[in-house]
Amino acid sequence: MKKVLLIALCFAIPMAGFAQKKKKKGAQPEVVAPVVETLSDEECMVNLSLFHESVKNKQFEEAYGFWLPVYQSRPDLNKAIYADGAEILDYRYQQITDENARKALRDSILKLHDDRIQYFDDAKYPDAYVLGLKAMDYLKYYAEDELAMPAYGWLKESVSTLGAKAQITVLRKFVEVSYNIYKSNTDQYSDQFLADYQLASATLDQIA
């Protein structure tokens, strides 16, 4: 049964990545992050509560104004800076139609993951877990990169490091991206895909 599941991961899942939401018309948010005044710890806690509540209520543009000063002042304060920040930046990305602005914002989304690794130490969600999230976002926002080599490296590190604690969605994408790379040059990448398949199979055994 496990092998059937793994084969399904390779061949039954579409290779197109993630669909983008429909672009909305109208006023668009500013892309370049404004220079904000550094907040005190007390002010950061207040803003943290405000942006978290705004995200819960899907008021993402309002949340951005509270979130950005906390992110810039105390990036080590709370995991919500990164969990909520990903939602806030994704919302802003969906509002923007200018291609250069979208490229700048998607770079900011990847940087959010880098900053989480650098500033926020979390035993429950270690660096390898965050790399999995970063890879998934790369596949979502950089869909034009057909081979997605950066995402492949992050996915492989996430799976090989986390083992039984690897996320199924990340494991699935790891096999999918590896197979896509293999298809681009079967002679060059056959050994790599076989090794990745074996790693995914062993990891799936651990999870199950």
Predicted regions, residues:
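Bacterial Sec-dependent N-terminal signal peptides
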Residues: 1-27, 86
